[in-house]
Every structure is written in structure tokens, then in C-alpha cells.
Amino acid sequence: MMYYCGIDEAGFGAGAAQVYVSACVLDPQKPINESLTDSKQLTPKKRELLAEEIKQDALTWCIATASVEEIEKLNIRKATILAMKRSLEGLTVKPDMVYIDGINSPEVPFPVETVVKGDSKIPAISAASILAKVARDNRMLEYDEQYPEYGFKDHKGYLTKNHIKAIQKYGPSPIHRKTYKPIKKIIDNQKNQQLELF
């Protein structure tokens, strides 16, 4: 029997917090309910329910992260690839084939194929997409309690108008990606304003 692993990330384009990556090998004997699709197409409630079902019925799965520090040091693409490797290392069954959403792939001892928009084409990627998004969204709710002034529960760290306004007003928090261009621009502007005061 062939085991296919799907990998997807959550938080690649965000301006705050870790990037999450999930690897998931579905059990051919236990097909997950037909509503598996790109996690962004599902309601939060539906995602939560499916995530529980996937965790229960998948052959093996692992959610890994790359920290803000790693993102700052390596860049977001390399940090995501690092988290992909970590997610694969956490699997208890070796996959025969790994399908990764998008165009980035790590060097791993398995055959790998990248699939653009794979989260809406390949069930194992859809499952990984749901696990990664649910895990990251839940973490962002915790960050919202820690840093309520930024509204993380609403935008999950992505740079909406309100999020940018909050960073301009309060400065970046410890979980903001300070090398991310829009945030770096805010920091540089604030430094220049301070210099003008002297």
C-alpha cells in the first residue's frame, strides 16, 4: 500500500507570529469526510471539526513551527522549509510520496512533488492545510489575550489596515516580524520621527 503525505503551511504571509507547517498521511482505510478542501474556503467551526476528525483518523500527522527569530534570521521561505522538515521528521509512518502545496520544498529522503493550489486538489494537502490553519489560528487567539491592542483575533497577524494602524500607534510587539517590509518601514519612520525631535 502506498502512503501519500500532504504538507501545507499557515502564516507565510503574515506580519506576526510563527509560521506553522503540517504534514499529514491519510489512512486509505478511513477516508475523511468529503468536505476536505483548502482550509481558507471553510468556516472556522467546520475547520475545527475537520481538524479533530483528521487527527483521529489520519495514519500519522505532525504540526511544526519556525519561530519569529528563525524567520528574521533565515527569511520566511527558508524558515518555512525548515518547519516542513520538522513536520516530516515528526511522522510515525514513512510516506512513499510527499505532496507540498506551493513551490517551495525541502531536501528530504522521500520523493517530493510541489503542487500549486494543492490544498484544493489533493486530499492529504487539504488535511495538512486544515491542521496548520487551526493550530495557528488558536495560537493567535492566545496572542490576542497577551497583546489585545493589536486585534490578532480578527486578522491572525496579517497586515490589515487596522493592524497597521495598531503597529503605528503602539509599535511592534515581541511577536511581530520586524524584518517584514511594511513593519520595518513603520519602525524606520518612528526612528526618523524621534531623531527629528532632538
From Swiss-Prot:
Which biological process terms from the Gene Ontology are attached to this UniProt entry?
A: DNA replication, removal of RNA primer; mismatch repair
Give the Enzyme Commission number.
Answer: 3.1.26.4
PROSITE patterns recorded: RNASE_H_2
One GO CC term on file = cytoplasm
Please write the reaction equations for the catalytic activity of this protein: Endonucleolytic cleavage to 5'-phosphomonoester
Q: Which cofactor does it need?
A: Mn(2+); Mg(2+)
Q: Which UniProt keywords apply?
A: Cytoplasm, Endonuclease, Hydrolase, Manganese, Metal-binding, Nuclease
Which residues does the record give as a divalent metal cation binding sites?
Answer: 8-9, 101
Entry's localization field: Cytoplasm
* Disulfide bond entries: none
Q: Where is the RNase H type-2 domain?
A: 2-192
- CDD domains linked: RNase_HII_bacteria_HII_like (cd07182)
Q: Bound how, and how many: what does the cofactor note say? A: Manganese or magnesium. Binds 1 divalent metal ion per monomer in the absence of substrate. May bind a second metal ion after substrate binding.
Molecular-function GO terms, alphabetical? manganese ion binding; RNA binding; RNA-DNA hybrid ribonuclease activity
- Is the keyword Oxidoreductase assigned to this protein? no
The task this protein performs is described as: Endonuclease that specifically degrades the RNA of RNA-DNA hybrids.
The entry sums up its family as follows: Belongs to the RNase HII family.
**Protein name (record):** Ribonuclease HII
Gene behind the chain: rnhB
